[in-house]
Regions:
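Charged, low-complexity intrinsically disordered terminal segments
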Residues: 3-223
Length: 223
C-alpha cells in the first residue's frame, strides 16, 4: 500500500526531487545501481551524501562492476570511503568467469525507509540529458513512500548483507507493513535475485496477463 507515489517521464524530471530527498536524510541512504558514472548527476549526489555522512547518516553505495566497468573504478571507491561512505562492488569482473552474466540491474535509492526511487534511470549524465550519447534520452522513473519504500530498503539490506562485511544493522527503521496507511491504490515492491529461484517477475507478469479482460500495455526498451 502507499501514501503517495510519483511517476517521472524523464530523468530530467526525477533528478531534482531525488536531490531534495537526499538532503532530508536523517538515518540512512541506500544507493544501488547497475551503472554509476562520474559527472553532473553523480557529483551532485556525492556532495550531498558526503555532507550527510559527516552528520552521522549511514550512507551505503552498491554498484555492478560490469555495468560500471568503464565509468567507476577503485579510485572512486577509495574517494567514497574517505568521505565516510560505505561501498560494495557487486560481482567483480573476472575474465572467463562462469559468473560473468550474474549482474545487478537494480536501480534504486532509498532514504530512511520512507521514500524510494526506482525505474530505468541509472546514475549517468545521459539519463538526465546533461550528456548526449544517442540523442535525447528517454527512461522512466518513479518515487514511492510508505510501505513500498520500506520494501525497497529491505531488498537493499538483504543484498548488501550477502556481499559486505559491514552488514546493515537489524535495528534500522523499516516501516511496519501492518500499520494502516491512507491509500487510494496499491503498490507492491518486489525483486528477483540470485537467492530467489522462483522467477518472481515472470510469475507476476503471467498472473497479471491471465487476469486481463480488455487490454495489456507494455513499455520496454528490450524484446
Amino acid at each position: 500500500m502507499y501514501k503517495r507515489q510519483k511517476y517521472y517521464r524523464l530523468g530530467d524530471e526525477l533528478f531534482p526531487d531525488m536531490l531534495n530527498d537526499l538532503r532530508s536524510a536523517e538515518e540512512y541512504i541506500f544507493v544501488e545501481y547497475f551503472i554509476i558514472a562520474n559527472g553532473v548527476m553523480w557529483n551532485a549526489m556525492v556532495d550531498i551524501m558526503s555532507e550527510k555522512a559527516r552528520q552521522g547518516v549511514d550512507v551505503r553505495v552498491m554498484y555492478d562492476d560490469l555495468g560500471s566497468i568503464s565509468t567507476f573504478n577503485a579510485n572512486d571507491v577509495r574517494q567514497l570511503t574517505e568521505r565516510g561512505i560505505k561501498c560494495v562492488t557487486f560481482n567483480p569482473f573476472v575474465v572467463l568467469s562462469g559468473n560473468l552474466n550474474y549482474r545487478d540491474h537494480r536501480k534504486m535509492l532509498i532514504v530512511d525507509g520512507r521514500v524510494a526511487y526506482s525505474g530505468g534511470i541509472n546514475i549517468a549524465d545521459e539519463y538526465i540529458n546533461q550528456k548526449e550519447r544517442f540523442g535525447h534520452w528517454k527512461d522512466i522513473g518513479f518515487r514511492v513512500t510508505g510501505t513500498p519504500a520500506a520494501g525497497y530498503a529491505r531488498m537493499f539490506a538483504g543484498f548488501w548483507n550477502a556481499f559486505s562485511k559491514q552488514p546493515v544493522p537489524d535495528g534500522y527503521t523499516f516501516i511496519d507493513p501492518s500499520i494502516p496507511e491512507k491509500t487510494d491504490g496499491y503498490v507492491l515492491s518486489y525483486c528477483d535475485s540470485p537467492f530467489n529461484a522462483d522467477s518472481t517477475s515472470t510469475k507476476l507478469f503471467i498472473d497479471l496477463l491471465s487476469q486481463a479482460t480488455e487490454y495489456a500495455w507494455f513499455c520496454t526498451p528490450y524484446l
